[in-house]
Amino acid sequence: MRIAPYGTGSVVKTAIFCFVIFITALFLPQPGGVILATAALGFLLFTLYFYRDPERKIPDGKGLVIAPADGKIVLKQTLDHPVTGPGSTLVSIFMSPFNVHVNRIPVDGLVRDLRYHEGKFLMAFDHRSMTDNERMEITLDTAAGPLWFCQVSGFVARRIVCDLEAGQEVASGKRFGMIKLGSRVDIVLPSSIQIKVKEGMKTTAGETILGQTGGF
């Protein structure tokens, strides 16, 4: 099982901690020692599961915009956006602690701008989190026009990882970061993109097609 590079440090620290707990448990009276050792093993296995980073098959096709995150679409609405213009579509993907948390680039492009905002830590399924929570906003210049998406931390997730830089060329489906322990990713698509998803649908980062346009 591949472990996300963004989580290597956390996995190593957890493994060391659990090893110490396991050794300590060997010298404790039973069944307390067994219970403690089992809990440590369970915690280590959950950590490995959380930081898993499976390979994804990027769909072939012209003009595809793919999901940047695993999860469930909790909001889809039309709006006017300062980056993507009038008639844009917002798609919000909620990521539970049991989803893969590695984020992927939705479409080929050039990173125009990155903006980090400090903020609150409301529950990620609370739509106020889009504007009130800690977040990283990313603007891509694409062949179909500008596209905006945002990593939003949640009540449990308080660590956003984004390894992009302004001016960087990026390819659809490539890993660019993660949000730890439950969160959401919002993406705003310009009106030139035909939306292929609806609220309630589950998404797979790097595979689920959110929309398509012939303008690429």
UniProtKB/Swiss-Prot annotation:
Per UniProt, the keywords (alphabetical) are: Cell membrane, Decarboxylase, Lipid biosynthesis, Lipid metabolism, Lyase, Membrane, Phospholipid biosynthesis, Phospholipid metabolism, Pyruvate, Zymogen
Spell out the reaction equation it catalyses. a 1,2-diacyl-sn-glycero-3-phospho-L-serine + H(+) = a 1,2-diacyl-sn-glycero-3-phosphoethanolamine + CO2
Stated name of the protein: Phosphatidylserine decarboxylase proenzyme
Which residues carry the site feature described as Cleavage (non-hydrolytic)? Answer: G182, S183
Active-site feature positions: S183 (schiff-base intermediate with substrate)
Q: Which organism is it from?
A: Chlorobaculum tepidum (strain ATCC 49652 / DSM 12025 / NBRC 103806 / TLS)
Pathway(s) served = Phospholipid metabolism; phosphatidylethanolamine biosynthesis; phosphatidylethanolamine from CDP-diacylglycerol: step 2/2
Location of the protein in the cell: Cell membrane
